[in-house]
A protein has these predicted regions:
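Cysteine-dependent hydrolase recognition
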Residues: 1-543, 547
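Positively charged, low-complexity/disordered segments
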Residues: 546-548, 552-554
Length: 554
């Protein structure tokens, strides 16, 4: 409560919590999508309020590998929530009984997961892949990880993802532990493929199962180059899947089982009168479980078998949160449906408003100029997410009547980066305000990874994950400005264009520019576009630089 008072809440006991944290929004629209902010149930003690919060890493069970996979939020390094004391009635948490546990097999360990990942470098300055530790110059590195409570009756599964780029050669990953080389497999090798000229990096994912006799996992990873010219060798991540004893650690534990044994129940050790067990399978609507307790052991039956649970002691020290800013009242959901939306960083609002006036006065358009951070507040719990832009446009599109409604326009007034989080070796030095970009593909192959603003215009129900076939329902443009001077210059050019009545060649001739890669398919596509334009009889082919015979595939 002391911290809440420092943030300006005079009565911390009246504070309520809204939001859904740091997990990336689903990219496919569905009827289960969250609209606006939801209130979370909390536990109130004499000194604090407790609620379940999600961070930027999401986990899911892989039925094929029998491991838990993780996904980093490609737009944010944190999860955000909103606090208010505006007389909201507290959300109540649903309770359920722990069920009949007599005669059932006790589950005393669970499937734990963890990840070591440093996102430092984008191999192709595109996509969502960021690699970590560099092995080019120091080819052998030792690692030590503490795994408190590991159940040594089962091996630790160590999943290693690694990337390298070697011209004319291959490489091998070699793992050693206690002076002994671990058994090798084909997935330890990184080789050149048939499309290596298009590769930014070639990745491998290899699995080692390691038996432990303590809570410490130590090993050495050697990157062994087998000929060729090396330009990149980086670790992506180590991911750990292992059995862990089911008990509280420093006052809390989050647990689950990928495969639940028949006729079984959880048996949590170290339970007390101040311990709570929540089913957080639906993190927005946690369910409190009332276990059967005997001598500090809490037994309860899972309802389905694949639920996610958290147990915590309300008196224990919990993770602290960071104050970000005070948020003024807003209501994008209450806006009159516009003809055009201009999304921009707040630094360029006045220039965007000039563009809005231009379209209003000359085209009769109703234009909404919106600070893009306010979109996150209502459509992604305050957490930056490109899908929040899309959800805003989906709301307006549906209100206009969908395909039967009037046209809708979107202008992105601000430059974007492939590094949305500004975490890489280039992005972290960018100081100008940016808008988010949608990055398609992992970023390993230049033919399969690209940036497209079309994503913000895929507004049909169930659209969003089929870039090649989803239909564009919004007219979209971007003015990639990165300074106030550029914003001023762009606005001036737009006004000059609209207000200049000279219908000379500068308004009536079009130059279409296309890449000559991929066997000139893009040039053919450009010609198809030209064929539907008027006055497109002349096509000018030019190369801005000397041709590279290896990369020019005509």
């Amino acid at each position: 409560y002391r911290e809440l008072r420092r943030w300006g809440f005079s009565d911390p006991s009246a504070v309520t919590v809204f939001g859904y944290g740091g997990a990336m929004l689903p990219e496919t629209f569905s009827e289960n999508d969250i609209d606006d902010l939801n209130q979370l149930p909390v536990i109130r003690t004499d000194s604090k309020i407790l609620f379940y919060a999600q961070g930027p890493i999401s986990w899911s069970y892989n039925e094929k590998t029998k491991e838990y996979d993780h996904e980093q939020n490609t737009y944010s390094t944190a999860g955000y929530y909103f606090l208010t004391d505006s007389k909201n009635q507290s959300a109540t948490i649903v309770e359920r009984e722990g069920g009949q546990t007599t005669g059932l097999q006790d589950i005393t360990s669970f499937d734990e997961h963890a990840v070591y990942e440093q996102e430092l470098y984008s191999p192709g300055s595109t996509g969502r892949l960021f690699l970590g530790d560099d092995f080019r110059y120091t080819t052998s590195k030792s690692f030590t990880f503490e795994l408190p409570g590991v159940d040594n009756s089962s091996p630790v599964k160590l999943r290693t993802s690694f990337g390298a780029k070697i011209l004319g050669g291959t490489a091998t990953l070699v793992f050693t532990r206690n002076g002994q080389t671990l058994p090798s497999s084909n997935t330890d090798n990184i080789g050149a493929g048939s499309s290596s000229s298009y590769d930014f990096v070639r990745m491998t994912s290899t699995l080692k199962e390691i038996d432990l006799d303590s809570e410490e996992l130590a090993f050495t990873l050697l990157f062994r180059q087998n000929g060729g010219s090396l330009s990149m060798a980086r670790l992506n991540y180590f991911r750990f899947n292992y059995k862990r004893k089911l008990q509280l650690y420093n006052g809390s534990i989050q647990f689950r089982l990928g495969q639940l044994p028949a006729n079984s129940c959880y048996n949590l050790q170290g339970y007390s009168t101040t311990t709570h067990i929540w089913d957080i399978s639906d993190p927005l609507n946690p369910v409190s479980v009332k276990p059967n307790v005997n001598n500090g052991n809490a037994r309860f039956v899972p309802t389905k078998g694949n639920e996610e649970y958290i147990a915590f002691d309300e008196q224990a020290t919990v993770a602290s949160v960071e104050f970000i800013e005070k948020v003024p009242n807003q209501n994008l959901h209450g806006l009159t449906t516009p003809d055009m939306v201009i999304l921009t960083p707040k630094e360029y609002i006045s220039y965007a408003q000039s563009i809005a006036r231009l379209h209003n006065e000359n085209d009769g358009m109703e234009v909404a100029v919106i600070d893009h951070e306010t979109v996150f507040n209502e459509f992604s719990s305050g957490t930056p997410d490109a899908t929040a832009y899309r959800r805003l446009m989906k709301m307006f599109f549906d209100r206009k009547g969908g395909l039967d409604g009037e046209p809708l326009y979107l202008l992105l007034f601000g430059k974007g980066l492939y590094d949305n989080r500004k975490i890489g070796e280039t992005g972290k030095y960018v100081k100008y305000p940016t808008l988010l970009t949608y990055q398609h593909g992992s970023g390993t192959d230049e033919r399969q990874s690209y940036t497209t603003d079309d994503y913000f215009g895929f507004l049909d129900d169930d659209s969003g994950n089929r870039i090649a076939s989803d239909k564009l329902r919004v007219n979209i443009g971007r003015l990639p400005i990165k300074s106030e001077q550029e914003a001023k210059d762009v606005v001036s050019k737009l006004y000059n264009y609209i207000e200049n009545n000279d219908k000379g060649s500068w308004k009536n001739q079009v130059l279409v520019v296309a890449d000559d890669e991929n066997y000139a398919i893009h040039m053919e596509q450009a010609e198809e576009i030209c064929s539907i334009m008027e006055n497109s009889d002349c096509l000018l082919y030019t190369s801005p630089s000397p041709r590279d015979t290896e990369r020019s595939r005509m």
